[in-house]
Amino acid sequence: MRRPKKYESGEATQYISRRAALRKLQLSLNDFRRLCILKGVYPREPKHRRRAQKGSSEIKILYHTKDIRFLLHEPIVWTLRDYKIFAKKSGRDRAIKDFRNLKRRLALFPEIKLDHIVKERYPTFIDALKDLDDCLTLLFLFSTFPSLHLIPREQSNLCRRLTIEFLHYVIASKSLRKVFISIKGYYFQAEIKGQKINWIVPHYYPFKPQSRQEVDFKVMSIFVEFYTIMLGFTNFRLYHGLNLAYPPQFPSGVLQDNDETLKDESSFVSERIAALNFELLRTDKLQEDEEEPDIDMELLEQDGDSKRIIKMKQDAQEITRLRTLFKGLKFFINREVPREPLVIIIRSFGGKVSWDSTVFSGSTYDEGDESITHQIVDRPSLATQYISRDYIQPQWIFDCVNQRQLLPTNQYFIGEKLPPHLSPFVDAKRDTYIPPEERALHDPSLIETHAQSDDESEEETAAQEEEEDAVEQELLDAQLQRAYQEETAEYKKYGGADGVNEDEEDSDDEQLYEDEDESDDDEEEELDEKAQRLLEEKQKMSVQSGKVHKVNKRQVHKAEVDEHRLQARMVKPRHRNLFRKLIREKQSKEKEEWLLRKKRRNIDTDAKEQKKTAKRDARKAAAAAAAAAAQLGAK
């Protein structure tokens, strides 16, 4: 039996360097990178790098050997090799100016087919939905790009078309759940087939080309190439699940025969689809306003009343109400407000929306429509206003969706200072800093106690002073009444202003002394009985006086430190780095929470000081105005 040599088995055979993989696949570095992106193969970090690299201490990019062996049987490898042959032959035809042969070769340009890769990477439809977050975020980003050197116009147009189709599905299925405005863009969360999908829609700013190539658009374009195929498959499956025609089409009532439609029907339809303001054509004739919930309520009713089942029932009822949150409301979007995010949100929850026809095609009613209930404005003032509608800022739409109810509009009027815009994508049970407004949302009892105004504090102090004065007055009245009773008793005891005879006085005194002796004897007997009763009760129940226990904070802190040191000593040597990392993360979180609390405290104190100074100035101004008026009246 041959003795195995070193690095012929074990970890050394499980990994392969990138250079060896390129030699094995006979591909260039760019083609290898493209193949790895399309197939989902990525570099690996070995447990023992020196063993994996066969004794070499140089840091190399390593892949699993089985992944490279898996790439050997990929049909795309032959297409990538055909690209080299095509480039050589087309270059030769250009050099000799054989344009006839060049035209023939361009017609036979080798195309990469990615259908089998999508099916291979996502065996089930749920797997594709789980990996849809990055896909949507990247495609929404590329849909805003103009034609660049490494991003062709056709790719940007395809990204725009696929994302609009997905938004139409979200509107038709009413699957939107959470929304949020951030510096990066608009965050959305939809629940499709039980999977929560999050994506970001960037803000609509003019594109600014970068002088330095900090972003590798070529690599991103390869990701987009795969994600477009994936989202196309997903949209097809989603549309057929709702009985919608794919590609999206309009009913015949929308396409009216006029000059605009007869000139170019395809561009008219594409513009109306991009408007997101029309219902799509269904393959069945039944128009279902609301999709039935995925949870079987009858099955839940058969189970016991456990907390989990009750919570599922409550969530199902909340989602049913949420789908019709804006039902019966008509919105009008002003020119300065971003149109597309608000149209998605309003239509996803049953509302109707329109805008100025000069901004974008697809508006359904004008600003002068009297049935409009809300107009969304993002400017300090308006020249003309209608009494029949509320003029609100765009944040009202987002906050209503996140709190799943229609909020009062008085805090969102034109020119009003908006309340804090809280993110719905945070965990309420987390250990980090939670703003007071968010705590008040989860616990309504905190609303009254949080951030009391100066008026309330002044009223409370005045009420406390009144109560103290009333208590003092009651004590004084009680003392006066007691003194008056004692004086009247003495007055009756020793006679009054009308004098009496001495004999009568002596007889009265004797009688009085006798009565007092009898009463004293009775009182002594009663006291003896009470004392015996108290002794019996004490024998039954013994109570000792409590002692105040003062906590020594220094000793408590020392005990915690000793416990932490003991815990650190008990950690195994191989887990010490992980333990230190966890401790550092905990300390950084505590420090961040402390800084945020301090910052919020400073903000609250500054706001209170500003309110006090404003009230003081207002009082001074009122007093000065009153004095001036009095002087004028005297003259």
Swiss-Prot record:
Biased composition (Acidic residues): 454-472, 500-528
Subcellular location(s) per record: Nucleus, Nucleolus; Nucleus, Nucleoplasm
Pfam families documented for this protein: BRCT_2, Pescadillo_N
Modified residues annotated as Phosphoserine in this record: 453, 457
Single GO MF descriptor: RNA binding
SMART domains named among the record's database cross-references: BRCT
Region (Disordered): 437-472, 489-561, 600-619
Alphabetically ordered keywords of this record: Coiled coil, Nucleus, Phosphoprotein, Ribosome biogenesis, rRNA processing
Gene Ontology annotations of biological process type: maturation of 5.8S rRNA from tricistronic rRNA transcript (SSU-rRNA, 5.8S rRNA, LSU-rRNA); maturation of LSU-rRNA from tricistronic rRNA transcript (SSU-rRNA, 5.8S rRNA, LSU-rRNA)
Domain BRCT per the UniProt entry, residue ranges: 321-414
GO CC terms, sorted: nucleolus; nucleoplasm; PeBoW complex; preribosome, large subunit precursor
Chief location: nucleus
Source taxon at top rank: Eukaryota
Record function comment: Required for maturation of ribosomal RNAs and formation of the large ribosomal subunit.
Cited HAMAP family: Pescadillo (MF_03028)
Similarity comment: family membership: Belongs to the pescadillo family.
Name of this protein: Pescadillo homolog
Source organism of this protein record: Drosophila grimshawi (Hawaiian fruit fly)
